[in-house]
Amino acid sequence: MQNKPDFKRELRCLAWGLLAAALAVLACCWTGYDLTDRLSELASYTLINDDYTRYADLTEQGLTQLVPVPAGEPVYGVRLKFDTHNTAYPAGEVQVELLTQAGQSLGAVRRDYRDIIGDVFVAFPLEDAYIPAADETLTVRITATQPWPGVVSLWCSAEEKDGMPLYSGDTAVGATLAVQQITAYAGQWPMRKALQLALPLGLGAFLAAWLLKRRAALPWVTAAVALCLGCAFVQVTPALTAPDEYTHLAVCYEKASRLSAQPTQGQDGKLLLRECDAPYFGTKTGKIGVLAYKQADTARRTQPGSPNVTTVTGAPQAGQSGNGYYAPQVLGILLARALGKNFYTMLAYGRMANLLVYALLAALAVALAPKAAQGILTAAALLPMPLQLAGSLSPDALLIGLVFCYLALCLRLRTHKAAAWELVLLAVLAAVNAPNKAIYLPAVLLCLMIPPQNLLAGTAGKTAVLRGHLWQAGVLGLAAASWCAANLGTALRFFGSHAGLGGAAALLIGAVAAACVLAVLCAFARCRRRNTEKRFWLVFALGVLAAAAAVFAVARRMPVPTPEMMVERLPNGESPYCYTVPYACHYVTVTLKMLVRSAVEQSPLWLQGILGTTLGEPIVYRIDVSWLIGLGLVLALAVAALPVQGSTPLLGRHTAWGVAGTVLCVVCAAVVVSMSWTPLSYTVLFGLQGRYLLPMLPAVLLLAKNAKGIFVPRDTAYPACAAVSTLTLLTILQGFGLYAGWQGAI
């Protein structure tokens, strides 16, 4: 009797999971049906003969046309031009059959009188492509399978074209039909692709509903749902259309070549590739649209791979910079190359490796966090944007997972004395977080939220506080050293080009800044022991203002473009000069107007970038899902951040101000870096995307949860995570429809 309630509860949870899976599969089927209904006739054509001089009548013997096809070019059928001579016949049917040079039938397509009225082009497409391995001549047989009550003609040339004779029965006509080769055709492919998505999306919906209904541990929920929905993103995102994916692919490919002892650079400085990869590498964002989708899928299934030998010179430049954040993608690509997989399979291996590492890091972050913060981290980790990045080759996915882990560990250490493994993990996370993008370097300051007495067990009183502050200073110093080791050369070049500083001056400023940070920490520890924190914050604020004034004064003395230089323009109409710190200090009003205008015009796009409701590379394609999904995600995150009535705040008042300051530092750093590549002719910031601020989203939600406002009687983490998972699933499906429905991509 004791087990019956539990058994019934498990059945209810299982029923919820099955219902969610059924709804997800039904949504996939509807998406496939809708896309097939709208796009099934979409095709692209190559002209074989464009001469429309005379007619060839379709007789009982039929017509036979020979069509040469080059090797490697897909053939989905042909398109012919008919003429019923201004007559709409009540009956009749035409069949077009394609045969290989060896006489093997590739398939036959029939069209009846309803499709052939007047002077009209009629396509006869096959569902799957035939790709000849060598140059080949195909045979096109045209027959009337049902008699026509009148004359039906096809347009042709006055004379026979070279190698393309036309026969009526066995008699040569001495002409060539006006024929177009169908090189791409949508057909029923959208439905097939939607059914492929039904597996990861249905499984993800089942696991989300089942685990959340059972109130399972949120780390397991995060890992399972992130993997399933991320797999769907791997399939939905067209090749090389994720943010900067073509650049990331070149970096990963070169690193994989080095690990496998293959040459990486040709004589012209271009990247060396395998033979099967060379046709697909590029230096720009890939194509989208249902035809591009199907071409990539066909190539993935049919194109052979190559041995892991780089012999062909590609388009990308060799020697592009990269760091350790590419490790998962490099290993995935290396495995695919070792197995001899083709290009698209290799790309999928790299994406899946990136997704796997992100899911593990996201689950680790949720496991490290205190229970009150787990819902926030789970909701943030399951947003469409981090999963889209994880389902591509972007190193930002690894960075997001590491920042989430670092924040979660800092929150964890606020609740108890640190164990040895936690101290080591804190130092490791600070060191590996720092080397990536400079805008995230201020995030290591989050370790200051840890009470210093919690950092070293076995000590008490003033000694514990002092040693704790020293440990925090050591963590910050380790992060700074790690960043300098990875980015010192880049930083010196940046300061030299955008701030007018030489290398020695930049190093001196960095050393002074590090000394100031250490002095501030020591002063804070001393004031805290003497209970004079208010005096410290006053002096600190005055010091910040003085430092800002000094920077402003020094920047005003640095050279900036003259008015004559500022009117110069490149051939594309842009200014050759970008915003710099000295320029901003010289022209404060112009800079402020540009920033305010950017905030007004681009803030919705930044929010979309944080949530992930704009897909792919927004600078190239604007793939925006419904604003209702974005609104739902904002509300779900707000629900996840609601504090429980009677609960203890995660952050103290001073700590909350410190976290807010850290977030502000990251935002300011992102703005300054974006200004450095914004031409002076622009009226808004160029290239600042919302995803740059995504790693700090949980910190913002923590501040909202810490605020005194609306309280709820019980934890809202599970409903919020269910809502985020559902909306992410809908984003994937609508994104698939928008990607497929994009016109003009081929």
Feature-to-residue mapping (PLM):
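Short acidic/glycine- and proline-prone juxtamembrane loop motifs at membrane-interface regions
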Residues: 392-399
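Transmembrane-helix signature of polytopic, membrane-embedded enzymes
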Residues: 216-220, 341-344, 365-384
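Interfacial juxtamembrane loops and adjacent helix segments
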Residues: 259-349
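Start-transfer (signal-anchor) and selected internal transmembrane alpha helices
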Residues: 1-30, 189-231, 471-472, 528-545, ...
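Membrane-interface alpha helices of multi-pass inner-membrane proteins
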Residues: 422-438, 443-449
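Membrane-lumen/periplasm interface segments of multi-pass, membrane-embedded glycan/lipid transferases
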Residues: 187-188, 458, 463-467, 473-541, ...
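Transmembrane-helix motifs of polytopic, lipid-linked glycan transferases
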Residues: 348-371
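Beta-sheet-rich sandwich/jelly-roll-like modules and their strand-loop junctions
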Residues: 7-100, 116-134, 144-200
